[in-house]
């Protein structure tokens, strides 16, 4: 919800609010304003803005204690409150996403070497060079252009031209066929036919469907074995190894625009109709279509209604926040029908901006062609990346429905930021402007939400699979909870991550929940 008139008013306050800070620019009666302003103007603007809109403005040091000759990041850090856990940020203004290969990864040391690594692909952006190459979540990169991954060669994974990658898969080697973690027969369907997001993941998901068909008998047998021969199973855990499967050509880096709706899927078990949504950002749309992603949510809600969905798994493991209206829309889709029009959240600003304090409701008008699913329970997959708007959704749904969290603790960002831009400087400042409470006045999740069922997916590498696969460990856990048949495989030893890399996502404008 961009407050543009307010932004302009704040910029006009600069000459007055900056006067106190300018005393250091006069020496022995000599006016040195013109000499120093090009070096200090940007920091002075940031200082005046923060003293007006920052939620914790009272904690900003006195002007005489500040250095206005610093770069923007250093200056912002020097004025932030101790309550601000890197929620407020400043960054350059970019019209296009930074070029990248479009995948994230985590490094693991090779067992036989102290200096070489394998890279586990943890995320593949849609319509990216990585997806074009056929990379999938759960793939292992073993070589880059024929070279081992080392501290010197790792940079080739993040930037550059065309690369050749040696790919492997993590498998458990043992005498008996490996167990599949899912129980029962599961059929999966993608979302709306012709949907670009679904098509982009079809290769991996078709393989998963085949696994469903071919693995069920083995799975049932294994379950019986588990019930009758637990001790024998413990003795035959097997060894995890990475098996080479071939080379792929990775196209050169290019600008990659992240899609908010990553994967939509329907999973049908006997007696259960389950919807799965991997939602990676609370973003309404694109520059070309401002409601593109919201409309995808609305269309998916209609599909869920048509299929008679009675359980919903919302995957927010990669969702680091976004726009407040998107939170309201998704909540409108999920909550019990009789809760529509009820209070949803309360925004509390600082005392200088108290006129902006306001209530948000579960506004059915936001549905605009979407439908309410009248759910009483929601299963949400979380991680340490889950933050901001994603946490707001969790907090604000809790008064109205049962929220079951699966995965890891969330980040603990309980405030909202707003983007401010001064045309004179190519920088965007995003200070914390308000605190976000649910309808019961609760906002105490600064340490994050702890999961009801804690699962560290890196401890189950055989099941570190593309999002939407019913065998992927976190989704599989959710399915097990829903069907009452949860049974986790034993964690594998010796899988300690060394380093993780994530591509830089675009910064959104407007009121962002962090």
Describe each model-derived feature in a short phrase.
Residues 272, 276-277, 281-292, 298-299, ...:
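C-terminal "post-core" interaction segments
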Residues 24-27:
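C-terminal motif of bacterial Sec signal peptides marking the signal peptidase cleavage site
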Residues 4, 93-95, 155-158, 267-268, ...:
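A general structural signal for short secondary-structure junctions and capping/turn motifs
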Residues 14, 18-22, 396-399:
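Secreted, disulfide-rich extracellular signaling modules
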Residues 1-2, 400:
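Short intrinsically disordered, low-complexity coil segments enriched in acidic
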Residues 3-15:
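Bacterial N-terminal signal peptides that target proteins for export
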Residues 29-311, 495-514:
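Flexible, low-complexity junctional segments that flank or bridge functional domains
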């Amino acid at each position: 919800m961009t407050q543009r008139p307010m932004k302009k008013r704040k910029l006009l306050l600069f000459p007055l609010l900056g006067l106190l800070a300018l005393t250091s620019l006069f020496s022995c009666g000599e006016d040195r304003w013109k000499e120093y302003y090009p070096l200090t103007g940007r920091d002075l603007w940031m200082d005046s803005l923060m003293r007006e809109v920052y939620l914790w403005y009272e904690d900003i040091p006195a002007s005489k204690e500040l250095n206005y000759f610093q770069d923007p990041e250093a200056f912002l850090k020097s004025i932030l409150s101790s309550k601000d856990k890197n929620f407020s940020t400043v960054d350059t203004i970019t019209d296009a996403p930074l070029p990248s290969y479009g995948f994230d990864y985590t490094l693991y040391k090779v067992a036989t070497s102290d200096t070489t690594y394998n890279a586990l692909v943890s995320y593949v952006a849609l319509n990216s060079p990585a997806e074009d190459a056929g990379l999938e979540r759960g793939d292992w990169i073993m070589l880059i252009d024929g070279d081992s991954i080392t501290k010197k060669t790792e940079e080739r994974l993040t930037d550059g031209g065309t690369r050749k990658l040696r790919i492997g898969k993590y498998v458990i080697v043992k005498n008996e066929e490996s167990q599949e973690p899912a129980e029962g027969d599961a059929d999966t369907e993608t979302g709306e036919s012709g949907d670009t997001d679904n098509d982009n993941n079809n290769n991996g998901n078709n393989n998963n469907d085949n696994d469903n068909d071919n693995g069920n008998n083995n799975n049932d047998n294994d379950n019986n074995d588990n019930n009758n021969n637990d001790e024998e199973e413990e003795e035959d855990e097997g060894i995890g190894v990475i098996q080479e499967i071939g080379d792929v050509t990775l196209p050169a880096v290019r600008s990659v625009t992240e899609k908010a709706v990553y994967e939509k899927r329907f999973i049908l078990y006997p007696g259960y109709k389950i919807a799965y949504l991997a939602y990676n950002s609370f973003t309404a749309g694109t520059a070309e279509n401002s409601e593109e992603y919201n409309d995808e949510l609305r269309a998916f809600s209609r599909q869920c209604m048509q299929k008679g969905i009675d359980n919903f798994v919302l995957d927010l493991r990669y969702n680091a926040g976004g726009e407040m209206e998107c939170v309201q829309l998704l909540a409108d889709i999920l909550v019990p029908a009789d809760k529509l029009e009820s209070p949803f959240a309360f925004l509390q600003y600082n005392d200088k901006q108290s006129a902006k304090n306001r209530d948000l409701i579960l506004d059915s008008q936001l549905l605009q062609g979407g439908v309410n699913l009248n759910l009483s329970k929601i299963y949400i997959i979380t991680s340490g990346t889950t933050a901001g708007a994603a946490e707001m959704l969790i907090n604000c749904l809790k008064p109205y429905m049962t929220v079951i969290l699966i995965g890891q603790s969330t980040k603990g960002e309980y405030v909202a930021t707003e983007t401010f831009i001064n045309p004179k400087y190519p920088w965007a400042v995003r200070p914390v402007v308000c605190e976000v409470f649910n309808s019961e006045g609760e906002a105490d999740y600064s340490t994050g939400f702890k999961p009801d069922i804690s699962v560290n997916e890196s401890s189950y590498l055989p099941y570190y699979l593309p999002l939407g696969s019913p065998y992927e460990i976190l989704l599989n856990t959710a399915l097990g909870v829903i069907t009452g048949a949860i049974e986790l495989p034993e964690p594998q030893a010796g899988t300690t991550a060394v380093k993780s890399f994530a591509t830089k996502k675009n910064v959104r404008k407007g009121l962002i929940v962090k």
